[in-house]
Amino acid sequence: MDVNPTLLFLKVPAQNAISTTFPYTGDPPYSHGTGTGYTMDTVNRTHQYSEKGKWTTNTEIGAPQLNPIDGPLPEDNEPSGYAQTDCVLEAMAFLEESHPGIFENSCLETMEVVQQTRVDKLTQGRQTYDWTLNRNQPAATALANTIEVFRSNDLTSNESGRLMDFLKDVMESMNKEEMEITTHFQRKRRVRDNMTKKMVTQRTIGKKKQRLNRKSYLIRALTLNTMTKDAERGKLKRRAIATPGMQIRGFVYFVETLARRICEKLEQSGLPVGGNEKKAKLANVVRKMMTNSQDTELSFTITGDNTKWNENQNPRMFLAMITYITRNQPEWFRNVLSIAPIMFSNKMARLGKGYMFESKSMKLRTQIPAGMLASIDLKYFNDSTKKKIEKIRPLLVDGTASLSPGMMMGMFNMLSTVLGVSILNLGQRKYTKTTYWWDGLQSSDDFALIVNAPNHEGIQAGVDRFYRTCKLVGINMSKKKSYINRTGTFEFTSFFYRYGFVANFSMELPSFGVSGINESADMSIGVTVIKNNMINNDLGPATAQMALQLFIKDYRYTYRCHRGDTQIQTRRSFELKKLWEQTRSKTGLLVSDGGPNLYNIRNLHIPEVCLKWELMDEDYKGRLCNPLNPFVSHKEIESVNSAVVMPAHGPAKSMEYDAVATTHSWIPKRNRSILNTSQRGILEDEQMYQKCCNLFEKFFPSSSYRRPVGISSMVEAMVSRARIDARIDFESGRIKKEEFAEIMKICSTIEELRRQK
């Protein structure tokens, strides 16, 4: 049956229909090939926005650098990065005047964090540029490699486990004449296969030592690796994002901690809160402006968009802000916080993999690595690429591009929010000293501006003044993309406000459905998503019930577990029918074993195993949840697991769901093809860390949330813990004398082995 889509909107208020215009159903677009072109675009654009600045050369690495700070006063309409230091400092001073003690208190809180943070803070996060291997790695591996190299180069402060001490090593490493690193390499050789008698290529992985001189090391320490941002909806062109190495990460973390503490105290900041808390915060600002615009005043709201926020921000500006914010603090603290912006002023952008060339006639493919772009003949490239390469060539040093201005995506979200809020703060009547005044909301590069004035001319004047003030600190409000409306209707960070926030349900659409982790987790996540949307996103009972039925259907198709009495034939139906026939209480079978669905919108919070426990046959229970069943015991499940769900907007969210360990909570094995590549050595390292950590957490169950602090090694700690536990168990009669003696013997053997080593 064809449905005329306009019929769907006959009785729907306009604000509820807005979400249907979002590009959120279906798969998001992914990028293919290399990000080299996008990265060159970013570098070239950033320099273009600051082109009237001063050129200097970094004496350490010989990189040309462009400094637009205090450059010519910005022009109308053209985005530019010419922030004026005195204006930024003045905005900071007024922010402090309106919020007495805000900087002082935030500094004290941050100082406490700085002294307590452990190095393992840096293991959080996904892909990280690993400077030792010159490519991306999981954060934990990159950190481990860095520490390993530091220790082999006599940098040992990090052994205390404090992040602060690791950063001391980073500082010292930059003064060393050379650093010795271990790199992985591949040897290929042709050998004859004994079985098939064919020639095959055999790969062996080797590790070799390599020395980096000071210049090469500094370049790597200051490098941001670039990739293409994936899964961005509603855009035609892809764009590049950056991932910094371990030397920069720690310093950035402390700066962002300080900025986060400041943002928490600012009512106009949309960070670091999220969800319903954020909505409440925003609603307060709107309420304040609407209440104050008495009958005599007009109130308008701009749904704002800034042009190229990151590319016009400048690390030198952030340095000025930090210098001001920490001005009465101890010297060591000021130094630690100023290093991140200084490193960013000297950053280098790695251009990615390079370009792929294909010759259709000769059926040849070859890759031109990014390092060769400086010297290769440009006749092979098309015009647009030629222009890009010509522009970027003067900036290249050893195949990386010097990128002093600009910030790259997502590095200082909190600190740039503080800058944005400081301009919103200047809209108070006492500062504008005229009939118009403004307030608003800022969340990284997204803003909403509310202007009140007695008449339209006043509103226009207020907007103009805001626009110009922003220009002075390197913020470029886009006149083309921002729009103004009577206060009461606007959009901010994909929240639609219409006399209150309307649920933008389409944003959640991608997270409905079967996640593909395993049967147990998928069932749990599926119902939790529906439950959460009933709580947070106006998902009504009837729609929720329908969503649930669709989910169960989807789930049954995904895992081929249709009800035991169905006529549908699948690979599993034969086994499931057999199970169905020999089960007395058929209601007790899990959906994934061909049982009926017992979920409705009232019991979504109960894990399926618990929901059906009383209804299960004894022998079914015994197979399903028996820890001695090899299909159960393989996986230890915390009582709460967390899954990654993909909302349509923003980063993947971690969502908690209840988990019960059954035969259905299997873990898929890792793809074997990785085992034959150069990643293999890294994989083995990773597994070793994983095993050590798992073992450690067996001895210290609380270690998953509170890291032990102290100087003894992990092994010493585990041995002493084992002895204590064994004695307690022996004295309380939980273990026999022989077992106790055996444990003690093992402990002594381990200590003996350590001494010999």
UniProtKB/Swiss-Prot annotation:
Its main location: host cell. Phosphorylated by host PRKCA. Belongs to the influenza viruses polymerase PB1 family. The lineage of its organism: Viruses, Riboviria, Orthornavirae, Negarnaviricota, Polyploviricotina. Its EC number is 2.7.7.48. A motif (Nuclear localization signal) lies at residues 187-195, 203-216. The keyword Nucleotide-binding applies. It catalyses: RNA(n) + a ribonucleoside 5'-triphosphate = RNA(n+1) + diphosphate. This is RNA-directed RNA polymerase catalytic subunit. GO terms for cellular component: host cell cytoplasm; host cell nucleus.
